Amino acid sequence: ATGSPAPDCVESFQSWRYTDVRNGCSDAVTVVVQYE
């Protein structure tokens, strides 16, 4: 993955099926993960 780290209020975690991202910020935040 490339780019700057997501803000602390954005939590990401991996389950056995998929990677889930939860936005805990008061403002909308777009998180983009690129696999190369």
From Swiss-Prot:
Originating organism: Kitasatospora aureofaciens
Matches recorded under Pfam families: A_amylase_inhib
Listed InterPro entries: A-amylase_inhib (IPR000833), A-amylase_inhib_sf (IPR036379)
Cystine bridges: 9-25
Remarks, miscellaneous: This protein is an effective inhibitor of pancreatic alpha-amylase. It is 5 times less effective against human salivary amylase.
A GO molecular function held by the record: alpha-amylase inhibitor activity
The protein's name: Alpha-amylase inhibitor AI-3688
Keywords: Alpha-amylase inhibitor, Disulfide bond
Cited function: Inhibits mammalian alpha-amylases specifically but has no action on plant and microbial alpha-amylases.
Lineage top rank: taxon: Bacteria
UniProt-listed SMART domains: A_amylase_inhib
